[in-house]
């Protein structure tokens, strides 16, 4: 971000185009998935299983499948995580994407497999360069 003013940073965040906002909807992978795929973060998609790591006691450690992703607000709806309205109808409790970890990936899309592979290769190259620079010193 260019400015240090919080108000300007919020303004830029709220007015981001959807293709850039999608990059903000990422979450850490669980330790097992990090070891399996060799990456640390990935964009959340509908169908992923996530675990809530921050929030109220009734939300904390809740695990469920992502039902909906809202790019406008940067929040996700998780299956089974609902509250009741005054008339008794259940509605989803929206959780910010940064407050969850991904425990199981939905790999039904071949494009997502390509994304994971591309990110893994980029991370390996980064680690090699980092290792070479530390050896040179």
From Swiss-Prot:
InterPro entries (alphabetical): Rib_uL2_dom2, Ribosomal_uL24_euk/arc, Ribosomal_uL24_KOW, Translation_prot_SH3-like_sf
GO molecular function: rRNA binding; structural constituent of ribosome
Keywords of the record: Ribonucleoprotein, Ribosomal protein, RNA-binding, rRNA-binding
Annotated GO biological process: translation
Pfam families assigned: Ribosomal_L26 (PF16906)
RNA-binding found in the keyword field: yes
One GO CC annotation: large ribosomal subunit
Keyword Iron-sulfur attributed: no
Family: Belongs to the universal ribosomal protein uL24 family.
NCBIfam families: rplX_A_E
Function: One of two assembly initiator proteins, it binds directly to the 5'-end of the 23S rRNA, where it nucleates assembly of the 50S subunit.
Subunit structure: Part of the 50S ribosomal subunit.
Name this protein carries in UniProt: Large ribosomal subunit protein uL24
